[in-house]
Amino acid sequence: MAEQIYTIPVNDAFDSECECPMCQMQRELERNAIEYTMGPSYMEDDNRAMTDKLGFCSHHLRLLYQEKNRLGLALMMNTHMNKTIKDMKELAAKGPAAKAGLFGKSTPNAPIVDYIESMEKSCFICGRIDNMFVRYVDTIFHMWKKDTEFREKFADSRGFCTYHYG
């Protein structure tokens, strides 16, 4: 099967001398996502809106701090924090959730608690990686079905880590 643009990252991972090609693809996706985030994209309105909304997990924030473009990170974090503070003030002004009576069902979380929990679980970079990784997995299955050369490459690989094997 002729190599297509969508098969290149998968072939590169299976060609590399690594213990787990899936981990290799994730590392490459993470490296690309960090470079994309810290590149000129941080000045684009749609990307800035996404980073303002999603923010970054602690792992990826640490990696962003290690990059050279500190001004770009400062701009992203400034607009993200301004949006977060504005959203939290609006939610705090609404007040706590109504309490149930003595024998009532448990009350739902206050909206501000739900907002904070959702912010802790969101990350712009994790989202980019997950979105692309699903496509890579689909590509692996497609190539395994259609490409005998890839099937041999797959069989000759060292296998997968326990995380990706499961």
Where do the language-model regions lie?
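Intrinsically disordered, low-complexity regulatory regions of eukaryotic proteins
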Residues: 1-166
